[in-house]
């Protein structure tokens, strides 16, 4: 992205024209004071001269636009100073495949942590790289840790993630594969089973302004949703609005220090057991899904669903009046009728009352179809016929009469009748 600078190259700006000061001095103002018609004529002449001068300066004024390219990303460390150091001995057996020690005490791994050699500075280190020309590029892991020696020649992005940087849920913003479950120490890449935006920050030096210190250091890596600090235990929970920013902040603040010389322990946070937090997370996911659906649908359709389309309101008021002036049907009746029309496939049908009255029972179907309604009573003749059909439509069925004896005689082999 290029920066734009505007330079005024008009002749008036380049060379100052000599001007005559016609403003009267203080002494002259006391002696000569225009009044009445003389004052009006003098004011009109000054206004006319000013308008002519502004018109001439507008015609001669030109602008020259200079486009400056974005600055390239700078190398964070000198490549000549890079050297591979063996890891500190924390166990009894060295694994050459994983370059780790094993067999040591489990609690020693937190006490033997070494401070990070460098820290990323977004304002100074960020810039364009080769990855900016490739769509879908991942972010540089070594840039987040502050030890990338390649600078603008790096194949990964050297900047902060934004809301427009979307990746598959099975990888993080650095392109590393996620797992189905978290590690026992809640470290590493994380899990793809749920979207985690909260970091656990431990081993913080306890002070009175610990919340302000944590918010100031972690706000550098993205927009923070909320921060919860346990002052007595030196523990903080930082929640970002974007998951990619949480992944970037986890790698950027690992083994770093705040205002003191502590070594932070940054891990993924477990699920918050607070019911209010779970409801808040569920509501956020619903809003995110609704926003995704809203972006996928046309703007006119979304406006009609949300009741912000004036044409839809006007059409509803006209077509849904059912022939009654001033009547506006409720939403339930409107959507039920619309769903019925969609099921029949009649797109041009309007929401009007049916021509034939609907019968309540099947017994009323025997009434004549073209009855003339009488206007002498309260109810119409069709309504009276429908009410009569309620009583006459009930049909009772009698059971078949049972035979009193066998239908045919039968013979017996026994002769003792």
UniProtKB/Swiss-Prot annotation:
It comes from the Eukaryota. SMART domains: RRM. Involved in the first step of pre-mRNA splicing. Required for cell growth and cell cycle control. Plays a role in the levels of the U1, U4, U5 and U6 snRNAs and the maintenance of the U4/U6 snRNA complex. May provide the link between the 'nineteen complex' NTC spliceosome protein complex and the spliceosome through the U6 snRNA. Associates predominantly with U6 snRNAs in assembled active spliceosomes. Binds directly to the internal stem-loop (ISL) domain of the U6 snRNA and to the pre-mRNA intron near the 5' splice site during the activation and catalytic phases of the spliceosome cycle. A zinc finger (C3H1-type) spans 134-161. Associated with the spliceosome. The keyword Nucleotide-binding does not apply. It comes from Emericella nidulans (strain FGSC A4 / ATCC 38163 / CBS 112.46 / NRRL 194 / M139). Residues 60-73 have a biased composition (Basic residues). Keywords: Cell cycle, Metal-binding, mRNA processing, mRNA splicing, Nucleus, RNA-binding, Spliceosome, Zinc, Zinc-finger. This is Pre-mRNA-splicing factor cwc2. PROSITE patterns: RRM (PS50102), ZF_C3H1 (PS50103).
């Amino acid at each position: 992205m290029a920066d734009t600078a505007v330079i005024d190259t008009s002749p008036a700006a380049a060379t100052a024209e000599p001007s005559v000061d016609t403003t009267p001095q203080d002494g002259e103002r006391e002696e000569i004071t225009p009044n009445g018609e003389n004052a009006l004529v003098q004011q009109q002449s000054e206004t006319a001269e000013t308008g002519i001068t502004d018109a001439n300066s507008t015609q001669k004024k030109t602008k020259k636009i200079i486009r400056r390219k974005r600055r390239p990303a700078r190398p964070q460390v000198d490549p000549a100073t890079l050297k591979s150091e063996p890891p500190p001995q924390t166990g009894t057996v060295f694994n050459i495949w994983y370059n780790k020690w094993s067999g040591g005490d489990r609690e020693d791994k937190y006490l033997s942590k070494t401070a990070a050699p460098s820290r990323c500075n977004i304002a100074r280190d960020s810039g364009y790289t080769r990855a900016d020309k490739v769509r879908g590029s991942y972010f540089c892991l070594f840039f987040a840790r502050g030890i990338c020696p390649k600078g603008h020649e790096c194949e990964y992005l050297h900047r902060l993630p934004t809301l427009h940087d979307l990746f598959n849920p099975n990888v993080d913003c650095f392109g590393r594969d996620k797992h189905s479950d978290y590690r026992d120490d809640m470290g590493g890449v994380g899990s793809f089973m749920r979207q985690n935006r909260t970091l656990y920050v431990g081993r913080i030096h306890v002070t009175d302004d610990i919340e302000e210190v944590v918010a100031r250091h972690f706000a550098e890596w993205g927009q923070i949703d909320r921060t919860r600090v346990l002052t007595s235990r030196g523990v903080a929970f930082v929640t970002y609005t974007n998951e990619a920013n949480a992944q970037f902040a986890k790698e950027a603040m690992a083994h770093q220090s705040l205002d003191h010389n502590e070594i932070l322990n940054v891990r993924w946070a477990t699920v918050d057991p607070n019911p209010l937090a779970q409801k808040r997370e569920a509501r956020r996911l619903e809003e995110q899904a609704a926003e995704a659906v809203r972006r996928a649908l046309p703007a006119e359709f979304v406006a009609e669903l949300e009741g912000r389309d004036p044409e839809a309101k006007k059409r509803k008021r006209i077509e849904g009046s059912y022939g009654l002036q001033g009547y506006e049907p409720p939403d339930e009746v409107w959507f039920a009728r619309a769903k019925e029309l969609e099921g029949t496939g009649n797109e041009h049908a309007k929401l009007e009352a049916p021509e034939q009255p609907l019968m309540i029972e099947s017994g009323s179907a025997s009434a004549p179809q073209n009855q003339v309604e009488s206007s002498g009573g309260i109810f119409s003749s069709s309504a009276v016929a429908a009410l009569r059909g309620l009583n006459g439509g009930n049909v009772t069925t009698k059971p078949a009469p049972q035979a009193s004896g066998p239908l045919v005689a039968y013979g017996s082999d026994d002769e003792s009748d």
